[in-house]
Design a protein with these regions (language model features):
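GNAT-family acyltransferases
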Residues: 1-130, 143, 188-193, 197-231
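Glycine-rich acyl-CoA binding loop
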Residues: 133
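Conserved GNAT acetyl-CoA-binding A-motif
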Residues: 146-156
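Conserved beta-strand-loop-alpha-helix junction that forms the acyl-donor binding cleft
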Residues: 155-164
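Conserved active-site tyrosine of GNAT-family acetyltransferases
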Residues: 167-168, 195
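Conserved catalytic-core motifs of GNAT/GCN5-like acyltransferases
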Residues: 174-188
């Protein structure tokens, strides 16, 4: 650990201490899905299905938002999403069906520190636990580290939301700790678990994602041959 002229330990100097960029992208193209900047005109009809018409009410338990009660409420929400630059919202289009089956966002965007959080994840049942869902996360990670030049990618969740925590760990996020009494929402107290990926970890994670997503990693029934952790 380097020392300053007072003989105090300090963090390592950075070769590049510049600010990162704000997200500004229309399309990230993958093999199984595309990640598209969310717009009402392009995505409202498909999103309405899993946000309202056939929404799973339990999906909203750990979200700050409540379930939608009308089509108009969904439209208003998506109009707000489209205009927002922090969070910056995306739709996930499944290539097999051609339908938008999920949304997520880059949030808590801090260009000065080159730090950003993945959040607001809502996936239709047809997208959950699929290659397309994993590829969508990979595409956005790649964009964050390689195009935006960020150093830190965060994932936070209610400490009781085990599916979210398990997803973070599977995707390669490292558990950092728990913020107790971190938030109040829906009349409840929330302890928040924090996870992250940092830029030095990205090259190995990228290799792991690409090995897992390769067509030869799946059999004729679409079952994986090696888990993401083992790739």
């Amino acid at each position: 650990m380097p020392l300053n002229h007072y003989q105090q330990e300090v963090g390592p100097s950075l070769a590049d201490a510049s600010s990162g960029k704000m997200p500004d992208v229309a399309l990230l193209e993958g093999r199984y899905c595309s990640v598209e900047h969310l717009t009402v005109a392009e995505h409202y009809k498909d999103i309405l299905d899993f946000y309202f018409t056939n929404q799973i009410l339990s999906d909203w338990t750990y979200m700050y938002a409540d379930p939608f009660e009308s089509e108009e409420a969904v439209r208003q929400c998506l109009e707000d999403y489209e205009q927002s630059d922090n969070p910056y919202f995306f739709a996930i289009r499944d290539k097999a069906s051609g339908k938008v089956l999920g949304t997520f966002s880059l949030m808590a965007i801090t260009p000065k520190n080159r730090s950003v959080e993945m959040g607001r994840v809502i996936l239709a049942p047809a997208l959950q636990k699929t290659r397309a869902a994993t590829e969508a996360q990979y595409l956005l990670m790649k964009y964050v580290f390689e195009d935006l030049n960020y150093r830190r990618y965060e994932w936070k969740c209610d400490s009781l939301n085990r599916p979210s925590a398990n997803a973070a760990m599977r995707l390669g996020f490292t558990y950092e700790g728990r913020f107790r009494n971190h938030a109040i929402y829906k009349g409840r107290s929330r302890d928040t678990d924090w996870f992250s990926i940092i830029d030095s970890e990205w090259p190995r994670l990228k290799e792991r994602f690409e090995n897992w997503l390769a067509p030869e990693n799946f059999d004729e029934q679409g079952q994986q041959k090696r888990s993401l952790r083992d790739c």
